[in-house]
A protein has these predicted regions:
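Helical scaffold of the NTase/Pol beta-like nucleotidyltransferase catalytic core
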Residues: 1-36, 62, 154-159
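Active-site nucleotide-donor binding segment shared across nucleotidyl transfer reactions
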Residues: 23-54, 58-60, 65
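Short secondary-structure boundary/capping segments
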Residues: 26, 46-48, 89, 113, ...
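Conserved catalytic core of two-metal-ion nucleotidyltransferases
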Residues: 74-108
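Catalytic cores of NTP-dependent nucleotidyl/adenyl transfer enzymes across multiple folds
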Residues: 107-160
Length: 160
């Protein structure tokens, strides 16, 4: 649930996405590399018109640098998602940033990010690495499989 009065709820186009990435980068001056994935990355590649938030993945140290600079500009919460994946969510003035930490997030997906050909955008101290479409689809496929397995567990069925 989004705090009242914070956020516009959706990132409606690539220009808005770039402005939001620039905002994050303007607050973090220390050299930091993060992977942009999920909806925002699909939007970057022109495969999605609107996305609800910006998802990034990085090391614990890089997440700490980002959180220490952004927490004063918005409300932060810790979230437990599908398969007990923990991540941080920061509600900023006009958008929501979700941070998945390499050491907490599932390693296979992070290895896919590390092996991917990536576009890169640098704003302030942050370089946003945007994986190729094939890698994004492979990660999305794994997320769908995890959702399916969770559904099967809820129904009491065996996962394969």
């Amino acid at each position: 649930m989004q705090p009242q009065g914070i956020g516009r709820n959706m990132i409606e186009n690539k220009a808005q996405l770039l402005a939001d990435l620039a905002y994050i980068g303007s607050k973090v001056q220390a050299k930091t590399n993060v992977y942009l994935f999920s909806g925002a990355a699909f939007q970057w590649h022109g495969l999605k018109d609107i996305t609800k938030d910006i998802d990034i993945c990085c090391s614990y140290e890089e997440a700490d640098r980002i959180v220490s600079m952004l927490r004063m500009f918005g409300k932060m919460e810790s979230v437990t998602g599908i398969n007990d994946i923990h991540f941080l969510r920061i509600f900023l003035k006009s958008f929501t940033l979700q941070i998945f930490i390499k050491e907490v997030w599932m390693g296979d997906e992070y290895q896919l990010l590390e092996a991917a050909h990536c576009d890169s955008l640098t704003f302030g101290g942050i370089t946003f690495l945007i994986p190729d479409i094939k890698t994004l689809l492979m990660i999305k496929d794994r997320q769908i499989q995890a959702l399916y397995n969770e559904w099967k567990k809820l129904k009491g069925e065996t996962c394969t």
